Amino acid sequence: MTEKEKIRNEVFELQAKINEWDNAYYNLDAPLVEDAIYDREILKLKKLEEQYSSYFSFEELANSPTQKINAKSSDLFKKVTHDSPMLSLNKAYTEEEIQKFIDNIKKVTPTFSFFLEPKIDGLSISIKYRNGQLFQAVTRGDGLVGEDVTENIKQIKNIPKEIAYQKPLEVRGEVYLALSEFEKINLNFQKENKPLMANPRNAAAGTLRQLDKEIVANRNLSAFLYNIVAPEDHNIFTILEARDFLKNLGFSVTKEATYAKDLSEINSYIENFKHLKKTLDYETDGVVIKLNELQHYDALGATNKFPHSAIAFKYEPNTTTTVLKNIFITVGRTGLVTYNAELEPVILSGSCITFATLNNYQYIKDLKLNKGDLVYIKKAGEIIPCVIGLVNKKHEETEFNKFLKCPYCNSDLIETDTLLEQYCSNENCPEIRRKKIIHFASKKAMELNSLGEKNIDVFINEGLLENVIDFYKLKEKKDKIMSLERFGTKSVMNILKSIEESKKNSLDRVIFGLSIKHIGSKVAYFLASKILKLSNFLDFDFDSLISYNEIGEKIISSLKNWVAKEENKNLVKDLLDNDVDLEFIATKKTERFAQLSFVITGTLSQPRSHFEKLIKENGGSISSAVSAKTSYLLVGEDAGSKLAKARALNVKILDEEAFNELLVS
């Protein structure tokens, strides 16, 4: 195969893949890949088409997804041709690309300024008014033809149905679903056992295409307006004037927009907005940079897809590509199966990544992954690296088969009702037992400092540890331990001392260490504050905890099932017989956060455990989920759905600076 044939094949494969993604995004409201992956591939295609344009005919390039918007009008709504095209925006990822955009403007005019605003992740809309009345609303569609959604647009409360302006007017903007409203909808869907909506953008697009306008009204869509068609007809000559005009007529505009004179001010806004965007109640992944002076727009021109008068800056995601060498499963202390990826080593966010999580089999199936494929991986802050998408398949026809047997004991793997989780069916699986023993000795549990994972494996292999209770019987086997390689008198005495010291731990440590399903360290701390002593554990009335925010029916059911098993009863009794009757020791130093419940989300300047410790030391409690009973949500970078839920429930939101102020107030 010649170089030309290779390039042509690569370009056609990219075009086909992106066309499939475009169809899912624009027409099915069901995106197949994250924005970061889409942007990377469209940029790759664009560069190939530009570099090797002589290899292709005019028609082959003109029909590329880099040159047109791949959206179709639905048959459910009347098709409407736009009076002027509704174009998309070209993207920039670096300062150099923004400078290139500015240099292009300099060719037309020596004096200019810019208008900057958030890039809203919603659905583009064009709205016409006649004699001050909302007359017609049309989606962008493919940029030339859209769908008439007038009746649905009339259900959006912040879009005026009439305005104090009699001349014909066409305005354009973005319909979106606020993160708080998105969370409310999914909470209701959850209660009604309906499938949850994937993200606010999909929810907004799907809502706007509803045939029942009552559904649209109930979902509380919103809109930001930012553009006026034929602005000179209304004596408008800059974006700033257009914004004021829209605002005075009662349209909603983004409060976070600003004016900039040069690249330095643009860069300053981009840097500041990176932190500001996490506090907003709508999804945004970048900044739109527009030439402020409208009279130069015609001279700058446009492609079939993008104008040259504006560009969208997008923040660089923490993603890269590498080869998926192998897929394997691990079994956790509760028997839960996790699918994992072995990767060709790659540097990401300053770390060498060789392994990443694949979550579960359905995740692999949805992404169509298999061994040998080139994949995207992502890492943010302390989050475990994760495979997030497929770049290229090694073998198009093959599908990865689900694991059906436990690799450690060869027992059947059983599935939950949702088919998303698999568990090893053997409660005596050696790997489950091993993970339970390792967990019991871990830092957050009983903190047996002198016993690392390697030493525990040696003890298990030598028959010294079969259950967590065996830690407290090791002193009887001191001579056997000392006969093992690398275990001298001093190291053995340190191990035994560490085990003896653990008997002074707080009750929550041992509850967490018992590997009870759904019981993390935060729940264990709460349980310990109510149970008070390990000797109370087996007879405690767990149903009495249902009224507390930290405890749900799933946790209560798990606790009752655990204490009902004879082997677990015997384990607790053995611990008590070996003087491990731990009592609850409150860690608080002050009452500053007494009666306050905190949830933490996002990446902070210190490990999450640092902030959890501060909260507990000052009398506060930690919860893993936001609810109406949550006092504060502490947010860091890349805060996710918890932030939206907090807004929906009017929970107070703190960044790290505000938290520190609260701590010393």
Curated annotation (Swiss-Prot):
Residues that hold Zn(2+) according to the record: C406, C409, C424, C429
GO biological process: DNA repair; DNA replication
Catalytic residues (positions): K119
The entry's keywords: DNA damage, DNA repair, DNA replication, Ligase, Magnesium, Manganese, Metal-binding, NAD, Zinc
Molecular-function annotations in GO: DNA ligase (NAD+) activity; metal ion binding
Residues covered by the BRCT domain: 588-665
SMART domains: BRCT, LIGANc
Domain of life the protein comes from: Bacteria
Catalytic activity: NAD(+) + (deoxyribonucleotide)n-3'-hydroxyl + 5'-phospho-(deoxyribonucleotide)m = (deoxyribonucleotide)n+m + AMP + beta-nicotinamide D-nucleotide
Residues bound to NAD(+): D35, A36, I37, Y38, D39, S88, L89, E117, R140, E174, K290, K314
Cofactor annotation: Mg(2+); Mn(2+)
InterPro entries: BRCT_dom, BRCT_dom_sf, DisA/LigA_HHH, DNA_ligase, DNA_ligase_AS, DNAligase_adenylation, DNAligase_N, NA-bd_OB-fold
Family: Belongs to the NAD-dependent DNA ligase family. LigA subfamily.
Function: DNA ligase that catalyzes the formation of phosphodiester linkages between 5'-phosphoryl and 3'-hydroxyl groups in double-stranded DNA using NAD as a coenzyme and as the energy source for the reaction. It is essential for DNA replication and repair of damaged DNA.
Name of the protein this chain belongs to: DNA ligase
